[in-house]
Amino acid sequence: MAANAINITETIDNSQVRSFQIGVFVLCGLCLIMDGFDVQSWGFVAPALFTEWGITSAAGRVASMTLIGVMIGSLLFSMLADKIGRRPVLIGATLYFSALTLITARVTTLDQLLIIRFIAGLGLGAIMPNAVALVGEYSPKQSRVMAMLVVSNGFTVGAAVAGFIATYLIPRFGWRSVFYFGGTVPLVIGLLMFVALPESLQFLTLKKKSGDLIAKWLKRVEPSIALTPASQFVVNEEKKEGVPIVTLFHEGRATGTLLLWTMQFMNLINLYMLSTWLPTIARGMGLAATAALMVGTMFQTGGAIGSIAIGKPIEKWGFFGVLIACFGGAAVMIALIGQPGLTKSMLFVVVFLAGWGIFAGQAGNNAVAATYYPTTLRSTGVGAALGVGRIGSILGPYVAEYMRPRYSTHQLFLVFAVPALLSAIAVGLLGMVMNRAATAKAAKATTIP
């Protein structure tokens, strides 16, 4: 390495979290909060909208069109981000889904609604993979996992507050007000990002972009670093060539990529299956309407707390043992939900713990995907895994709807536990694959020619 070379990777790894990085985390977190708000608020808007339009049922179709858009957007815009950068894609996607959400407030027919929600979903799909990737790339090594988990939990926070905001707005201003709110806030966030959000320093270095721009943002990360006009910037990886989605399977990554996809698919089919049907099934178990709604709330609350709580254990013990515990524990808790004789208090606790495992596992899935791939494939890798997972999120509610009249409640939740168990197995296998790859890399590095 040249005497005037500055290693970007090591500088960020060894830095402290300063106000500049916190600003990056906050902006990315706000994007994810509004992402979660947009997806979840539809469930609260639908009854008022369909009453006004005189439609009996189409909520599932609208939700599915949004999720299909998210699935496609996760893949397409993630590949684009690995070509042109995280910053332009995040800003563009935020302003894009802001505009489409505002347009949603003006639709007058079901066909218009279906089309607009699909198109809006394309932009929503770009947010999670690029926000998580950028946060990881600006985080010091010792706090990277926690930063990615906290920021990705913004989606869960947004989903949780959607109900409160929609409940306040709809009776006073009508269902359209929810979309006005959901479109205006990301517009402001997008403008703030345009002013303050930096590009990934690793990306800029690998793409051989302006040294002055790299120096400007690197100084914000580590003010004490000595830079001169002759400074050259390097990272601890090489630029990868080829079609990004195909390259995910190169250099020994094929098995790991497929296992990541399996983890995302199984967990998201479970998450959306339970989020959609828990209150309805609880009502069928004999609970009062208020108690049945509380079951769904406990699931989301457990998820919000668990998504942050697993950060320290992962930093101490690593991803794989913690995620196996999350998914394995969730499988047990889900199986217990349908057990006869479960008291209401016990049901709330079991559902809370199931939500903890499922949502915490999802946050962990996103973080481990971001650490698995190199910079030039990071957004594509996270986005592709989420895109495959979104297939599960689309199928989940329909699978539950098909199974519900054919199985007893006890049998139903035993079946619901299977995806969590498969997620735990996939995590264990991925851990073995990554440990074997790390051992081989270390052996190669220490071999003397």
Give the predicted meaning of each segment:
Residues 1-37:
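Cytosolic juxtamembrane N-terminal segment immediately preceding the first transmembrane helix
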Residues 175-238, 425-447:
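Central mid-sequence intracellular linker of multi-pass
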Residues 49-50, 80-81, 165-173, 282-283, ...:
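Interfacial helix-cap and linker-helix signal at transmembrane-aqueous boundaries
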Residues 43-72:
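Extracellular/periplasmic helix-loop-helix junction of adjacent transmembrane segments
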Residues 72-110:
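Conserved MFS/SLC helix-loop-helix module at the cytosolic interface between two early adjacent transmembrane helices
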Residues 54, 85, 106-112, 140, ...:
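Helix-breaking motifs and short loop linkers at transmembrane-helix boundaries and internal kinks
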Residues 42-43, 249-307:
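Extracytoplasmic gate region of multi-pass secondary transporters
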Residues 145-171, 185-186, 386-396:
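Glycine-rich segments within core transmembrane alpha-helices of 12-TM secondary carriers
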